[in-house]
Amino acid sequence: MPRSRINGNFIDKTSSIVANILLRIIPTTSGEKKAFTYYRDGMSAQSEGNYAEALQNYYEATRPEIDPYDRSYILYNIGLIHTSNGEHTKALEYYFRALERNPFLPQAFNNMAVICHYRGEQAILQGDSEIAEAWFDQAAEYWKQAIALTPGNYIEAHNWLKITRRFE
């Protein structure tokens, strides 16, 4: 049974009904419908913490999805799951792939910056300040891009950039 039919709460059920109506009304190809169904089911599984199921649905959604904008969000969500699972190298790969298709995803830049910042902190703990600075510099570049896309957001990152004198 598709996940969209087993969601338990009112909002999920309502969203599923609205999405199904829109899929019938809006002219879309069968591939687009299939991709959307997998994407929706992936989001539902992800919100419940079922990451393996979410990944499976997202991977399935990438097959029929040809629109680069829509595909970017699928790839971004795959990156989120890999981040949650501590698979930072894989997460960075998927954030990069999402940004190749849609360079206006500030949340992808932010998440990449967070991973780089984390790696910088890990390098400090290992006593490698040179590597740490390289990671922090990379984090700064990603945060600058996120802030440029959405001025006023990412206040903590903005403050970190100022405190560390990485903001120009």
Curated annotation (Swiss-Prot):
UniProt keyword Thylakoid, yes or no: yes
Database matches in PROSITE patterns: TPR, TPR_REGION
Family matches, as Pfam families: TPR_1 (PF00515)
Principal location listed in the UniProt entry: plastid
Membrane topology: Peripheral membrane protein
Subcellular location: Plastid, Chloroplast thylakoid membrane
TPR repeat ranges, renumbered to this chain: 35-68, 72-105, 120-153
Keywords from the named record: Chloroplast, Membrane, Photosynthesis, Plastid, Repeat, Thylakoid, TPR repeat
Gene Ontology, cellular component aspect: chloroplast thylakoid membrane
Keyword Thylakoid: yes
GO BP term, pick one: photosynthesis
Function recorded in the entry: Essential for the assembly of the photosystem I (PSI) complex. May act as a chaperone-like factor to guide the assembly of the PSI subunits.
NCBIfam families: PRK02603.1 (NF002725)
Family named by the database record: Belongs to the Ycf3 family.
Name of the protein in question: Photosystem I assembly protein Ycf3
Native source species: Phalaenopsis aphrodite subsp. formosana
Native organism taxonomy: Eukaryota, Viridiplantae, Streptophyta, Embryophyta, Tracheophyta
Gene: ycf3
